[in-house]
Amino acid sequence: MSYPDDYSTDIEKNKMDLKEFKEKTQIAELESKVLRLELKNKDINRENVQIKKENEILKRELDKLRIPPLILGTILDKVNERKAVVKSSTGPNFLVNLSQFVDPEDIVPGARVCLNQQTLAIVEVLPKEKDYRAMAMEIEEKPDISFEDIGGLNNQIRDIKEVVELPLKNPELFEKVGIVPPKGVLLYGPPGTGKTLLAKAVAYETNASFVRVVGSELVKKFIGEGAKLVRDVFKLAKEKSPCIIFIDEIDAVASKRTESLTGGDREVQRTLMQLLAEMDGFDSRGDVKIIAATNRPDILDPAILRPGRFDRIIEISMPDEDGRLEILKIHTEKMNLKGVDLREVAKIAENMVGADLKAVCTEAGMFAIREEREFIKMDDFREAISKITGKKEKCSYDMPQLTVMYG
C-alpha cells in the first residue's frame, strides 16, 4: 500500500517532533534531578558545618574536663614582684612564682589565688570571698510602706529621719554645722507598736540599699561563724553604700555578757564583740547607717548602748487616743463604713497598739461578712475589740524599762 508524499512527510515530521519532545523531557528531568541534588548538597553542607561546630564545642569541653583542677591558696606575704608566700588549702606554706598572666599588683596578703598542681605557680587571682548568707540579706525590692502609712508616731518618725534619712539625702547640712552625722538608732517598745514598720518606711523613702538581719541569724553553732557573718554583712553594706542595715530582734545577739561557761553563750559573746568592733571600728563605715529594734531593752549589753554605736535611742510607746485615731484612719481608708465613729472606737480600744488596731479592723470586716453585709457597723468594731481584748488578756506583756536613755 502506498501513501501520498505529503502524508509520508508528516509522519517523518511527527517522528522528529516526538524524538525532540522525549529529548527535552529527559533534559528537564535531568535538570530537575540536578537541582534536587544541589539542594540536598546544600543541606548536607549546612549539616556538616553544624556538626563541625558542635564537634569543636565538644572538643573544647573535653579539653576542659582533661585539665587538672587547681589548688586554692591564700597569699601570706609578697616577697617581690614575681614571688609570694602562699598557704595552700592542703595545709603547708609554699614560696611560689607568679605566672606571667598574673598582675603583681593583685597579689596582696589575704588574696585568694589558684595554684598549678605540679609547679604550684600562681595562675589566677580570685575575687574576694563573699558569704552567700550575707548576700541573701540584701533586699532587692523595696517595701511598699511609706511614712504616710504609719500613724501615731510623728515624733519618732521625725527622730529617725534626722538620724538615718537626712545624713543620706543631705549630708552637706552636717558639714555646714560642723558635726558628724549620727551612726545608728535603736528602736525599742512593746510588740506591735511599729518598730519594723518604721524600718520598712525608711527603706522605702531612701534610695539606699537595705540589708535586713534578724538577730538570731547571727548566732551560729561553730566557733567564728557568727563573727564572720557579721564582718561579711558590714563588708556588703560598705560595697553597696549608701546602705542601711536593719537588725531586728537585736537582743538575740546583744544580750548582757555573763560568766556563763557554756559553749553557746561564749559564741554569742564572740559575735557580739565582732558586732561592737564593726559598729565603731578603726575603719570608717562611710554611708552605712544602722537601725536596730528590740522589745527587751533591759537585757541589752551596756556596751552597745553607748553613744557612737547607737547615737539615738527611740522609744516606740503605746499610742494615745489621737495616735489610735490616726492608725484607725489609715486601716479603714478603703473599708466600707456606715455609722462608725472612729473617735469612739479609739476611746474604746484603750491600751491597744497598731498591730491590735489592724486586727480589730480585720475582725470587724469578718463580722460583717459573717452577717452577709457589704458594710461595717459600729457594733462590728465593738465585738472585734472585745474579741481582741480577750486574746490580749490571756497573754499579757509588761514592757521592761530601759534605765540608760539619751538621744
UniProtKB/Swiss-Prot annotation:
Subcellular location: Cytoplasm
UniProt cross-references to SUPFAM superfamilies, sorted A to Z: P-loop containing nucleoside triphosphate hydrolases
Superkingdom field: Archaea
Main location: cytoplasm
Docks into pockets in the proteasome alpha-ring to cause gate opening: annotated span: 405-407
SMART domains for the chain: AAA
Binding residue positions for ATP: 192-197, 331
GO process annotations (BP): proteasomal protein catabolic process; protein unfolding
Gene3D superfamilies, alphabetized: 1.10.8.60, Nucleic acid-binding proteins, P-loop containing nucleotide triphosphate hydrolases
Coiled-coil ranges from the UniProt annotation: 22-67
MF terms in GO: ATP binding; ATP hydrolysis activity
UniProt keywords, alphabetically: ATP-binding, Chaperone, Coiled coil, Cytoplasm, Nucleotide-binding, Proteasome
Endpoints of the signal sequence: none
GO cellular component labels: cytoplasm; proteasome-activating nucleotidase complex
Domain comment, as recorded: Consists of three main regions, an N-terminal coiled-coil domain that may assist in substrate recognition, an interdomain involved in PAN hexamerization, and a C-terminal ATPase domain of the AAA type.
Quaternary structure (record): Homohexamer. The hexameric complex has a two-ring architecture resembling a top hat that caps the 20S proteasome core at one or both ends. Upon ATP-binding, the C-terminus of PAN interacts with the alpha-rings of the proteasome core by binding to the intersubunit pockets.
Similarity-based family: Belongs to the AAA ATPase family.
Alphabetized NCBIfam families for the sequence: PRK03992.1 (NF003069), proteasome-activating nucleotidase (TIGR01242)
Function in brief: ATPase which is responsible for recognizing, binding, unfolding and translocation of substrate proteins into the archaeal 20S proteasome core particle. Is essential for opening the gate of the 20S proteasome via an interaction with its C-terminus, thereby allowing substrate entry and access to the site of proteolysis. Thus, the C-termini of the proteasomal ATPase function like a 'key in a lock' to induce gate opening and therefore regulate proteolysis.
Protein's name according to its UniProt entry: Proteasome-activating nucleotidase
Origin species: Methanococcus maripaludis (strain DSM 14266 / JCM 13030 / NBRC 101832 / S2 / LL)
